[in-house]
UniProtKB/Swiss-Prot annotation:
This is Large ribosomal subunit protein eL39. One of its GO terms (molecular function) is structural constituent of ribosome. GO terms for biological process: translation. HAMAP family: Ribosomal_eL39. Gene3D superfamilies: Ribosomal protein L39e (1.10.1620.10).
Amino acid sequence: MAHFKPLGKKLRLAKALKQNRSVPIWVIIKTNRRFRDHPKRRHWRRTKLKA
C-alpha cells in the first residue's frame, strides 16, 4: 500500500480496522454465550476490502 493515502481511503481503512474486532467478553457473558463470534469478521489474507 502506498505511503500517501487520500483522507477518505484512510478513514475507510480505519473504520474497517475498528469493525474487525471480536465480540467483547462482557457481551458473551451477558447474552449467555449466544453471541460468541460475529459473522462479519474479516481476515486480512482471505477477504480483501473494497476500500
